[in-house]
A protein has these predicted regions:
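Acidic-basic catalytic patches of nuclease active cores, encompassing PD-(D/E)XK
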Residues: 1-42, 53, 146, 150-154
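Active-site-adjacent loop/helix micro-motif of nuclease/hydrolase catalytic cores
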Residues: 39, 66-77
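Short connector loops at helix/strand junctions that flank enzyme active sites
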Residues: 41-43, 55-59, 75, 86-88
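Conserved catalytic cores of phosphodiester-cleaving nucleases, focusing on short active-site segments
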Residues: 44-50, 54-66
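Long, compositionally biased, intrinsically disordered segments
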Residues: 48, 52, 77, 95-96
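Nucleic-acid nuclease catalytic cores
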Residues: 84-110
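Helix-rich interaction surfaces within compact, conserved domain-sized segments
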Residues: 110-156
Length: 157
């Protein structure tokens, strides 16, 4: 990919950054493992720092709804909670469904309880609305029209 192409492809049509995972590779993961047991790290599913105007508002680990259960006492999640608590930021593990889009929240620290209930399941619209509230912003009518407002069948039974 040329430098010029990268510059023109940094943002999608709606102004959000494009996915950049093509810049990463498996070799660094393998190399880091070679550094030994006393140098632990974890490759997370999709760790996001939700932010507004350059200031973080939440630390969220997104996981597909069929991913393995998360143990918040595991060193990985204790480290993430400590990181979030130091700011302090809400820390959440959020499972997602894709058809329709929906989200189930697992609370990772006390700060998250201000925004969500543990185990709360939300439609895409309700979840995104909450993310906007964290930023003290409002969902636009245009975005509102695009978001799923129902839950998948397996969540409504």
């Amino acid at each position: 990919m040329t430098h010029k192409h990268r510059l023109t492809q940094q943002f999608s049509h709606n102004g959000t950054r494009l996915e950049r995972t093509a810049w990463r590779d498996e070799q660094i993961s393998a190399r880091h493992r070679a550094w030994g047991f006393d140098c632990p790290a974890v490759d997370l599913d999709f760790l996001a720092v939700e932010y507004n105007v350059g200031k973080p508002v939440a630390l969220i680990e997104y996981k597909y709804h069929k991913a393995a259960k998360v143990d918040l006492q595991h060193a990985t999640y204790r480290a993430l909670a400590d990181l979030a608590n130091a700011y302090p930021l809400p820390f959440l593990i959020v499972r997602y469904w894709r058809e329709p889009w929906a989200f189930r929240v697992q609370i990772g620290n006390e700060a998250a309880l201000h925004w969500f209930n543990d185990g709360e399941t939300l439609s895409e619209f309700n979840y995104v609305k909450r993310l906007y509230l964290m930023r003290r912003a409002k969902v636009t009518a245009e975005l509102h029209a695009k978001l799923d407002k129902t839950l998948p069948e397996d969540l409504t039974k």
